């Protein structure tokens, strides 16, 4: 079944794939990485002015990595805001997705965390660097194929 936003995107010739609805009835769409930035700008102009959360996950060992965006359309006088979930998949070898920092400023730390834990590079992000792990850390700890080092010495911060 096609949702309201998916029908609107089809009407305007914007490429996407509908993934149905989640358990709360929120429409979920898949966008290709090369189309994501332009569609993000269009969604912002359409009224999705709030990035509620951004996260990432490893689909399967050796498989794709996913960056997930939960967007909300908040309007004055509307009791129930409209929500949508966007999934952007990237290959494991060179995971690159356009950053939406310049569309929603709240993507800043969230994209940095996804980079730090999964190694997804967000193109045009102004401060894309590790946020949780030390700069000297090797690898991406939340990937399913990550091998935990036997020993890691953290340098004294003082």
Swiss-Prot record:
Its EC number is 7.1.1.-. It catalyses: a plastoquinone + NADH + (n+1) H(+)(in) = a plastoquinol + NAD(+) + n H(+)(out); a plastoquinone + NADPH + (n+1) H(+)(in) = a plastoquinol + NADP(+) + n H(+)(out). It is found in: Plastid, Chloroplast thylakoid membrane. It is an enzyme of class 7 (translocase). The keyword Nucleotide-binding does not apply. It comes from the Eukaryota. One of its GO terms (biological process) is photosynthesis, light reaction. GO terms for molecular function: NADH dehydrogenase (ubiquinone) activity; quinone binding. It is a peripheral membrane protein. InterPro entries: NADH_DH_suC (IPR010218), NADH_quin_OxRdtase_su_C/D-like (IPR037232), NADH_UbQ_OxRdtase_30kDa_su (IPR001268), NADH_UbQ_OxRdtase_CS (IPR020396). NDH is composed of at least 16 different subunits, 5 of which are encoded in the nucleus. NDH shuttles electrons from NAD(P)H:plastoquinone, via FMN and iron-sulfur (Fe-S) centers, to quinones in the photosynthetic chain and possibly in a chloroplast respiratory chain. The immediate electron acceptor for the enzyme in this species is believed to be plastoquinone. Couples the redox reaction to proton translocation, and thus conserves the redox energy in a proton gradient. Belongs to the complex I 30 kDa subunit family. This is NAD(P)H-quinone oxidoreductase subunit J, chloroplastic. It comes from Spinacia oleracea (Spinach).
């Amino acid at each position: 079944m096609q949702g309201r936003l998916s029908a609107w995107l089809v009407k305007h010739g914007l490429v996407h794939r509908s993934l149905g609805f989640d358990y709360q009835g929120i429409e979920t769409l898949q966008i290709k990485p090369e189309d994501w930035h332009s569609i993000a700008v269009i969604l912002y102009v359409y009224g999705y002015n709030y990035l509620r959360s951004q996260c990432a996950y490893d689909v399967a060992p050796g498989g794709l990595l996913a960056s997930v965006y939960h967007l909300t359309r908040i309007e004055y006088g509307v009791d129930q805001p409209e929500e949508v979930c966007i999934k952007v998949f990237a290959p494991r070898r060179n995971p690159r997705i356009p950053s939406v920092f310049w569309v929603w400023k709240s993507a800043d730390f969230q994209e940095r965390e996804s980079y730090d834990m999964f190694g997804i590079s967000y193109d045009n992000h102004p401060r894309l660097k590790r946020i949780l792990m030390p700069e000297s850390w090797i690898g991406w700890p939340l990937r399913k194929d990550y091998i935990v080092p036997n020993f890691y010495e953290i340098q004294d911060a003082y």
